[in-house]
Amino acid sequence: MAEPSQAPTPAPAAQPRPLQSPAPAPTPTPAPSPASAPIPTPTPAPAPAPAAAPAGSTGTGGPGVGSGGAGSGGDPARPGLSQQQRASQRKAQVRGLPRAKKLEKLGVFSACKANETCKCNGWKNPKPPTAPRMDLQQPAANLSELCRSCEHPLADHVSHLENVSEDEINRLLGMVVDVENLFMSVHKEEDTDTKQVYFYLFKLLRKCILQMTRPVVEGSLGSPPFEKPNIEQGVLNFVQYKFSHLAPRERQTMFELSKMFLLCLNYWKLETPAQFRQRSQAEDVATYKVNYTRWLCYCHVPQSCDSLPRYETTHVFGRSLLRSIFTVTRRQLLEKFRVEKDKLVPEKRTLILTHFPKFLSMLEEEIYGANSPIWESGFTMPPSEGTQLVPRPASVSAAVVPSTPIFSPSMGGGSNSSLSLDSAGAEPMPGEKRTLPENLTLEDAKRLRVMGDIPMELVNEVMLTITDPAAMLGPETSLLSANAARDETARLEERRGIIEFHVIGNSLTPKANRRVLLWLVGLQNVFSHQLPRMPKEYIARLVFDPKHKTLALIKDGRVIGGICFRMFPTQGFTEIVFCAVTSNEQVKGYGTHLMNHLKEYHIKHNILYFLTYADEYAIGYFKKQGFSKDIKVPKSRYLGYIKDYEGATLMECELNPRIPYTELSHIIKKQKEIIKKLIERKQAQIRKVYPGLSCFKEGVRQIPVESVPGIRETGWKPLGKEKGKELKDPDQLYTTLKNLLAQIKSHPSAWPFMEPVKKSEAPDYYEVIRFPIDLKTMTERLRSRYYVTRKLFVADLQRVIANCREYNPPDSEYCRCASALEKFFYFKLKEGGLIDK
């Protein structure tokens, strides 16, 4: 390829067309000459390759991450540090040239001014270098040397630069290097849409060199920022909204995870609109194209072409772009960290592999949730949520900050923590934290225990143990273990790329591609073979019906199973029509993993009910997947919509949008391991040894477990004796709790607990109290339907009292109010049948 600086240059009249919002554009002629090709309306694509980089080199994903999305090789706008350094070194090299050599390089991009009739728009060296990048080694051309094109001297091309400062000359030379890089990228880039955007930027920078102006991307794309609040503000709001009630150290952990996520986004390579189109609905593609083009022009390309103004992705984009990219970016991020986990130090490994996935899952709820407050422009938290920590004054009541449950168990949820029973010594001074008195009994201590107080350090220590093979002694666990989850094999095969899942369907406009059609034929064959009583023509009609979709399971390039379904968004449910896995691939967990993927797909589309008619052989499978014969969807919503099968049973499955179904069995397994280790540690703390049982020598054959000495002190509780009556109907539970809370708030002793504690009254309250709560926050939680069981409600009431007693001296007015209120609400709980009398 010819040296870019010696390539034919565009005429001064050729202005770059303002960059428009992406729209269908004619496909340009392959590999056009950047100097003469017309500028089509650009659409987004990956970024260019540096002129100095070898062909086929790829960009990295930024610090600690990998590139998301595919792109062609060699990419300066998505550079790793080495590529950025190459561009910087090239510019430093050019700026260090003698002035005569600088004028020669700028003359290549400067129109001839010998006379008005000369249309030459760039000086052509009569002795061009024999190889690219050899121009810097050649001696500077004389100002009298004639242009190979117009035969006017170089001086006529650079006369306008005679009185220009050295700084301005260097700025123009920086644009020259960027133009050369973009020139190479236009020719190397294979994606048509990408080529168009680079070509536009190439022309824009050439025009700016010619006119000695600064580049400004014009058109209907708008100017940064494009959304408010931006991604960074939304994520920081999320951390404050979800984790502000944590202890400072744990809150800092969440903050570090958020900064790591934002850093990854700023250096992440987005997928092209063509790739996005394959997994999204048509109406979303146009919006994504606009955002993608903005990202290319304002964030991606300027990373190495610093002549263009650069903005951070998380500073100029908001919820719209994040919704488009989050699911793909999250999967690629976690996979990248999983592959490179051995390179991480143990502390970071626990943080990233254990806490980061849950952090992203919770963030996902706020990104796709309909009423998340973190995206409101005026988002604020009560003043009590500040993180400033200073010495505390006299005693104050307990209070809380609004929050929702966080990582469990890894972030502090779960078992009760042990309380110190050391002597408290003298009466605590004002401002001094109380310890438990010497004569406190075990029953008294139990009253102060509140669920969710496992120290973060203990959880991290347990997590390191269960993830360290050397520390986990005992029999080797494997996929052959009797305790392995049904979908464990399928999940591992998916991670290794052995199997793939694709949601596909027939399409008439545009016509489905050949690969999709072949997969649909394969699905038709699988369903026909596995469902012999179903007419083949009927199966073919539904599989190829554009209104139906199929989640296809692909192994070694061929279809081995799938679930055919039809979505009814207006009715709020989906009908599952066919579900089958080829016979020689069964009993491997593929069916369970298929259904879990289907559940997550529907959660993303906000459809939370499945309906299906199951024959006698399929009822067992559907029961294992959470289906029930108890139909909650009103008959009026599905009557006339779904197909009725003779001899089949209608079954329903309600989806929980908070559950990551494809990882659920893995999460439960980890939770069991954590609880088991915590129990082992608890057992090690119990020093008391009881004598052996002598009753068996006297002929007694068995005794109740609760009569074993010391069994209750270990925390054991009898099974099947659930205290209180659990209300199944959510509306009935809501009404009961609402009335109870209103009575508690109207009690004369409730006044200290009505509002969150103000930091002006107790500056260190949130340092001492790790899980604050108050009646105002309980009212907000009740209104948002947070209390799905009575246990959650009772636990918050208990914590109100426990926090007050932990913070304040026992003879304070606040503790007296707490005791009076405690007696009252326990009386009301018993009266309402919520606990045993």
UniProtKB/Swiss-Prot annotation:
Pro residues composition-biased segments: 7-51
Keywords annotated in UniProt: Acetylation, Acyltransferase, Bromodomain, Chromosome, Cytoplasm, Cytoskeleton, Host-virus interaction, Isopeptide bond, Nucleus, Phosphoprotein, Transcription, Transcription regulation, Transferase, Ubl conjugation
List of residues binding succinyl-CoA: 579-581, 586-592, 617
Modified residues (N6-acetyllysine): 549
Effect of residue 735 to A: Slightly reduced ability to acetylate and inhibit PPARGC1A. Strongly reduced ability to acetylate and inhibit PPARGC1A
Cross-link (Glycyl lysine isopeptide (Lys-Gly) (interchain with G-Cter in SUMO2)): 728, 759, 791
Tissue-specific expression: Expressed in all tissues tested.
Major location category of this protein: nucleus
Modified residues (Phosphothreonine): 735
Annotated catalysed reactions: L-lysyl-[histone] + acetyl-CoA = N(6)-acetyl-L-lysyl-[histone] + CoA + H(+); L-lysyl-[protein] + acetyl-CoA = N(6)-acetyl-L-lysyl-[protein] + CoA + H(+); succinyl-CoA + L-lysyl-[protein] = N(6)-succinyl-L-lysyl-[protein] + CoA + H(+); glutaryl-CoA + L-lysyl-[protein] = N(6)-glutaryl-L-lysyl-[protein] + CoA + H(+)
Domain notes: Loop3 is required for substrate specificity and adopts different structural conformations in succinyl-CoA-bound and acetyl-CoA-bound forms. Tyr-645 has an important role in the selective binding of succinyl-CoA over acetyl-CoA.
Biological function: Protein lysine acyltransferase that can act as a acetyltransferase, glutaryltransferase, succinyltransferase or malonyltransferase, depending on the context. Acts as a histone lysine succinyltransferase: catalyzes succinylation of histone H3 on 'Lys-79' (H3K79succ), with a maximum frequency around the transcription start sites of genes. Succinylation of histones gives a specific tag for epigenetic transcription activation. Association with the 2-oxoglutarate dehydrogenase complex, which provides succinyl-CoA, is required for histone succinylation. (Microbial infection) In case of HIV-1 infection, it is recruited by the viral protein Tat. Regulates Tat's transactivating activity and may help inducing chromatin remodeling of proviral genes.
Protein name in the entry: Histone acetyltransferase KAT2A
Natural source organism: Homo sapiens (Human)
Name of the encoding gene: KAT2A
